[in-house]
Design a protein with these regions (language model features):
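Short, structured segments at the rim of ligand-binding sites
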Residues: 1-190
Length: 190
């Protein structure tokens, strides 16, 4: 909706049952109309920049989506009116945006309420010739536990030891359980 006028959205399985509020309300308030409130629907209109305000305990994906759209729509501030769920994933989004030339100002009050992210007017993504996408700690955790249970070592490649992904904590769980965790660059063996 930030770069084109009409978008058809469909979903299968359990996806149509996922909550889309407060995202739909905020998009409606910023120039987008929907043929209905659940998929399948057609989004019409271009998303406009401005101040977005949503509860943070429904989905961090709403915040990531608006952050990624913000450079295309102008100055935008996105504020969470409740503590932000899965904030590590929003941090991953803002770090990736920084890697591609967009600095996001993050304001975190002491209460974790009214946490705000601002993308300045005129910000734009820059292309990169090479970029390594770090591995997914959620998926890696399953295999690390399997290695611990079977006693058969496994090496998982492309992992960032210092990732902001919450599931990286599995490393400490493995160590606390007595497993050997050995790093070699971006590869981890359990």
């Amino acid at each position: 909706a930030s770069i084109c006028n009409d978008v058809d959205v469909d979903a299968k399985g359990r996806l149509p049952d996922r909550p889309l509020e407060p995202m739909l309300s905020e998009m409606k308030a910023h120039g987008v109309t929907f043929s209905q409130d659940k998929p399948p629907f057609t989004m019409t209109g271009r998303l406009q920049g401005g101040n977005f305000s949503m509860v943070g305990d429904v989905s961090s994906q709403f915040f990531s989506g608006l952050l990624l759209a913000a450079p295309q729509i102008g100055l935008s501030t996105i504020t969470s009116t409740t503590p932000l769920q899965s904030s590590d994933y929003v941090t991953l989004t803002t770090e990736t945006m920084r890697d591609f030339g967009v600095e996001v100002e993050h304001t975190l009050p002491d209460t974790n309420i009214n946490e705000a992210f601002t993308v300045p007017f005129g910000a734009s993504f820059i292309g990169r010739d090479n970029y390594q996408i770090e591995g997914d700690w959620s998926n890696a955790a399953i295999w690390m536990v399997a290695a611990a249970m079977t006693g058969k070592p496994i090496t998982i490649t492309g992992m960032n030891k210092n990732s902001v992904q919450a599931d990286r904590r599995i490393m400490q769980v493995m160590i606390d359980a007595g497993c050997d965790v050995v790093w070699d660059g971006m590869n981890v063996t359990v």
